[in-house]
């Protein structure tokens, strides 16, 4: 039974430190992608990046082009070219793979110097593309339409696609993002080093969320609370949310100076590489503080939702098909009644939502090394929302041992989180479930009472 009771909140984790990706990890990434290219008969990949859509590029290069655009051209023999704008050209020799720099000022900011007499096509000709027979274009989206040829949907800027088509008129062009984030894509699983790398951001998001929830008080502004949702100078991978009362007034999506009032609906979100934390509830401390027409919020929305989170955590396991997890959530939280529409769980990495093996009729296998977000979003008419979106990592016995040996401090944090979730929240976890933050599954629906949270009795 789901109960709202008083107990100690999770520990605020200190001494969080970033873990860099090793040279061995970067070499492994490159080789696994080259193997995928061979399997699918690609002569080369052209991988696009901008700040928001650059994770496939960053996966191999180690950096994002910030305010510019960029291309990585990777041939099946391992030869690589970095096509860069004015202010990223100096990053080529800093990249995590050996690549020849090619300057394309067209990728720079508007009105910056265009000191070239060459067209986009002529610049791309420096990347040894003319004799390729099959080219994979990689943006950020693995299309899954049932009505179109997904291999012919390209999410790169037209000026680049057009130049490739003109330069290589006889080549087959395909969307190849699937090699990265589709079923069995190279980015869908992580080694011990990658887990440690991503755990830092996920843990930081959890700490930020716990600190922010502790700052919620009547009369405080959204901005005052939102100050806690950023930390250590780290870049967010989602828009920070701290909203009280009605949302999206005059289309605003950012925290502002609106103050918290009793009975307000509250929404908070923060995220970094490796994981996001989101919370939804009310600015109340007890049922009697809720608006009259919403006094059954706990039984109508919040408790069924938390039961779905419990079910998700207790059901997910290595080797199950995505549809099995999807059906479990549909069983305990029917879409028709609770209004959720998206995948109840997705993979995370540098970006908050990378892809998802969890969907109707999915035969994709959930595997060791997958970094998951518990993302279930009910929408019940007449009530505010509820959320405790957070993350876990799946690791088989061998991967767990590798993490324990290489990163004992992180392993210790993980064990403390597991103990809290099982002993305080009452949720049973398989050995393969590694919570990525101390806030995972912790939910205070009445946010003015900082001692009340859901548990399973």
Model region roles, listed by residue range:
Residues 1-457:
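Active-site neighborhoods and metal-handling regions in enzymes and metal-associated proteins
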């Amino acid at each position: 039974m789901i109960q709202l009771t008083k107990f100690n909140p999770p520990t605020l984790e200190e001494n969080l430190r970033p873990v860099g990706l090793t040279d061995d990890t970067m070499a492994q990434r490159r080789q696994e992608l080259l193997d995928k290219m061979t399997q699918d008969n690609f002569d080369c990949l052209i991988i696009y990046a901008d700040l928001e859509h650059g994770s496939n590029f960053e996966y191999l290069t180690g950096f994002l082009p910030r305010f510019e655009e960029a291309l990585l051209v990777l041939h099946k023999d391992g030869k690589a070219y970095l096509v860069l704008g004015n202010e990223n050209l100096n990053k080529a020799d800093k990249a995590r793979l050996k690549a020849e720099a090619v300057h394309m000022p067209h990728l720079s900011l508007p009105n910056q110097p265009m000191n070239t007499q060459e067209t986009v096509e002529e610049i791309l000709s420096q990347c040894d593309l003319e004799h390729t027979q099959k080219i994979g274009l990689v943006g950020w989206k693995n299309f899954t339409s049932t009505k179109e040829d997904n291999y012919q949907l390209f999410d790169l800027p037209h000026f680049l696609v057009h130049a490739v088509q003109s330069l290589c008129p006889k080549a087959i062009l395909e969307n190849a993002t699937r090699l990265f984030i589709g079923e069995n894509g190279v980015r869908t699983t992580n080694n011990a080093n990658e887990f440690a790398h991503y755990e830092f951001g996920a843990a930081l998001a959890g700490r930020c969320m716990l600190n922010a929830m502790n700052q919620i008080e009547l009369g405080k502004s959204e901005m005052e609370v939102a100050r806690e949702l950023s930390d250590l100078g780290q870049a967010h991978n989602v828009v920070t949310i701290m909203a009280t009362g009605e949302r999206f007034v005059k289309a605003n999506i950012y925290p502002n100076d609106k103050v918290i009032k009793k009975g307000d609906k509250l929404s908070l979100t923060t995220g970094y590489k490796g994981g996001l934390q989101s919370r939804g509830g009310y600015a109340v401390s007890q049922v009697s503080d809720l608006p009259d027409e919403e006094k059954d919020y706990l039984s109508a929305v919040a408790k069924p939702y938390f039961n779905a989170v419990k079910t998700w955590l207790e059901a997910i396991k290595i080797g199950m098909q995505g549809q099995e997890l999807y059906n479990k959530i549909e069983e305990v939280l029917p879409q028709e009644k609770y209004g959720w529409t998206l995948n109840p769980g997705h993979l995370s990495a540098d970006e908050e939502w990378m892809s998802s093996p969890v969907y109707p009729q999915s035969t994709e296998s959930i595997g060791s090394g997958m970094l998951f977000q518990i993302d279930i979003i009910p929408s019940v008419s007449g009530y505010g929302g509820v959320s405790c979106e957070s993350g876990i990592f799946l690791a088989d016995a061998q991967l767990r041992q590798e993490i324990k040996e290489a990163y004992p401090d992180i392993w210790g944090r993980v064990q403390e989180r597991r103990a809290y979730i099982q002993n305080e929240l009452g949720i049973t976890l398989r050995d393969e479930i590694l919570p990525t933050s101390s806030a995972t599954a912790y939910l205070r629906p009445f946010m003015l009472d900082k001692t009340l949270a859901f548990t399973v009795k």
